[in-house]
Regions:
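A short gly/proline-enriched turn/hairpin at secondary-structure junctions
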Residues: 66, 70-81
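Bacterial N-terminal signal peptides
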Residues: 7-17
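Surface-exposed, charged secondary-structure patches
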Residues: 86-127
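Short hydrophobic/aromatic-rich beta-strand segments that constitute the beta-sheet cores
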Residues: 73-74, 114, 144
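Short beta-strand segments enriched in hydrophobic/aromatic residues
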Residues: 67, 118-120, 148-150
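Short beta-strand edge/turn micro-motifs at domain boundaries
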Residues: 26, 127-156
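Positively charged n-region of N-terminal signal peptides that target proteins for export
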Residues: 1-5
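Short, low-complexity N-terminal intrinsically disordered segments enriched in polar/charged residues
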Residues: 20-69, 155-156
């Protein structure tokens, strides 16, 4: 079964709403304090570690293979890229030792998400933030349907 982008957004909204139902909102971290890191299930953690490795190596095709065929990459300071070819074309050189940390995740059926932060060893301040919308592929592996990130608050 192929979930179209509109259907995926509806399904992801249901997952997020379900994950939030009946829970109290945690205390918001300060501008420079990041939420506590959490451990992910192995299948979700694999997505983050494979992303880090492909980014570090500047391997656009390998990074793009982590996405659904029509996936989106929406990154600070870059045009929106849709599809594996566009995503692969956006990575042309090694990106450094990217460190991804998960703060929250959820899944239901074939959709899920990871909310987290990113930084490099030399990052000053809080670092950036990301949301990965995930979809389970035909082989059961989780693929990125959308990667949304921003650079986060500026270091003071």
């Amino acid at each position: 079964m192929v979930i179209r982008p509109a259907g995926f957004v509806v399904a992801l909204t249901v997952v997020i709403a379900g994950a939030r139902a009946g829970t109290q909102a945690p205390q918001a971290p300060s501008e420079t304090q990041m939420p506590a890191a959490i451990s992910l299930p192995p299948a979700f953690d694999r997505v983050l570690r494979d992303y880090e490795a492909a980014w570090r190596d500047g391997d656009g095709p390998r990074l793009a293979a982590l996405f659904t065929e029509d996936g989106f990459a929406v990154q600070s300071g870059s045009p929106i890229r849709r599809g594996r070819a566009a995503i692969a074309g956006g990575i042309t050189k090694p990106g450094g030792s990217l460190q991804l940390t998960a703060y929250a995740y959820s899944s239901s059926g074939t959709v899920g998400y990871i909310i987290g932060g990113y930084r490099y060893p030399t990052t000053v301040g809080a670092g950036g933030r990301f949301v990965l919308a995930l979809q389970s592929g035909p082989d059961g592996h989780w693929l990125i349907a959308a990667d949304l990130d921003n650079s986060g608050p500026r270091a003071r």
